[in-house]
């Protein structure tokens, strides 16, 4: 399967010090050897490879997501250059979804003029209201970042910027009330949002995750959020995780790495031009995301031929025996690949969130089946 989503890292530094960050605070520390900012030479090589791949496979629609670190640290000129370079390499008729994923702290009127001019959509990471958000997403000196992020979001929600609004990302903390968090996010009127499980694995379990007790704290949190979202009198926003589970239950295919068995269809390009697998693998071990290839010497098709990438396009065959025997495997898909890791055993075991995912899926399934039976769906 060709690559349809390219994550282009234009900055490897960040203006926040989030304590759950998989890039800076977990097992992999390769960021220390990366350039702080991407160069125009690397941008040119990266966008040329993207265009080459699009042409070779006759793709009609692709996404390029500008990432970091904090990508806005690269500055307005870098954004302008990247946008121009990406569009120059596109074959005629190809639709490009050019987005940036930011913590929102640096968003201001001047930046929005640039973003509007180059049609760069904006996703913002925010974890709920002030108390929820500032548990983790703080500045290096310890000050919370909520006020600055909220200020940027209010600008994003203004009429002249609204068409750029891609959505919100929220990392789950089970200490926070899920309904409070969801409703705090709704205050910014997002067109879409997603709840992300904090990165962890069997060798470094996520907070509050003990498989010995059989408890499912993350499922309970997500179930409360799901029920609040699902039972609203009208759809207040799209929630990707919930919609993907429903889509899979109804026989569809997944469009996210969190659930489902669809082949991986994205690649990361770091600030030095190196190709990498999904960034979340940095939570597993040093070098977990590396493939030893780069935009200067290798095509995107070469990345597709790498054994680690090929193994993630095998669907059910890439999973361990216990997953393949599971009744919800087509929905769960083994969960996020990074969450399956165990030191000395690799990635061929269930997700560290296995019990939570199973509980959540059964709950969503019961709700959807009841509505289908009653004719309310």
What are these regions, as identified by a protein language model?
Residues 16-21, 29-30, 130-134, 202-206, ...:
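Short acidic/His/Gly/Ser-rich catalytic and metal-binding motifs that mark active-site loops
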Residues 27-28, 332, 363:
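Short, non-ligating residues that shape and space the ligands of small metal-coordination modules
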Residues 243-355, 359:
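Accessory C-terminal segments flanking Radical SAM cores
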């Amino acid at each position: 399967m060709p690559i349809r989503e390219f994550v282009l890292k234009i900055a490897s530094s960040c203006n926040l010090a989030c304590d759950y960050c998989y890039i800076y605070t977990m097992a992999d520390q390769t960021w220390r050897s990366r350039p702080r900012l991407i160069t125009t030479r690397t941008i040119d090589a990266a966008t040329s490879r993207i265009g080459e791949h699009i042409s070779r496979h006759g793709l009609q629609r692709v996404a390029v997501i500008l990432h970091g670190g904090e990508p806005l640290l690269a500055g307005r000129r870098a954004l302008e250059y990247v946008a121009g370079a990406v569009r120059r390499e596109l074959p005629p008729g190809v639709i490009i979804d050019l987005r940036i994923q930011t913590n929102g702290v640096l968003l201001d009127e001047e930046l929005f003029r640039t973003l509007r001019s180059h049609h760069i959509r904006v996703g913002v990471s925010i974890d709920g209201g002030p108390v929820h958000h500032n548990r983790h997403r703080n500045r290096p000196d310890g000050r919370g970042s909520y006020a600055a992020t909220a200020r940027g979001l209010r600008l994003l929600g203004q009429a002249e910027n609204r068409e750029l609004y891609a959505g919100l990302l929220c990392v789950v903390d089970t200490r926070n009330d899920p309904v409070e968090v969801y409703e705090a996010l709704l205050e910014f009127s997002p067109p879409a949002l997603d709840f992300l499980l904090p990165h962890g694995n069997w060798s470094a379990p996520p907070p509050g995750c003990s498989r010995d007790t059989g408890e499912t704290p993350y499922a309970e949190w997500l179930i409360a959020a799901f029920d609040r979202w699902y039972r609203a009198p009208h759809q207040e926003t799209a929630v990707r995780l919930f919609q993907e589970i429903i889509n899979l239950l109804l026989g569809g295919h997944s469009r996210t790495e969190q659930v489902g068995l669809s082949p991986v269809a994205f690649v990361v390009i770091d600030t030095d031009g190196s190709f990498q697998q999904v960034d979340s693998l940095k939570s597993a071990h040093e070098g977990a995301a590396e493939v030893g290839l780069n935009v200067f010497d290798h095509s995107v098709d070469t990345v597709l031929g790498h054994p680690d990438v090929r193994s993630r396009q095998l669907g059910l065959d890439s999973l361990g025996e216990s997953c393949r025997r599971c009744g919800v495997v087509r929905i769960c898909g083994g969960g996020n690949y990074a969450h399956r890791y165990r030191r000395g055993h690799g990635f061929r075991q269930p997700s560290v969130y296995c019990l939570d995912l199973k509980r959540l899926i059964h709950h969503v399934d019961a709700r959807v089946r009841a509505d289908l039976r009653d004719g309310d769906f």
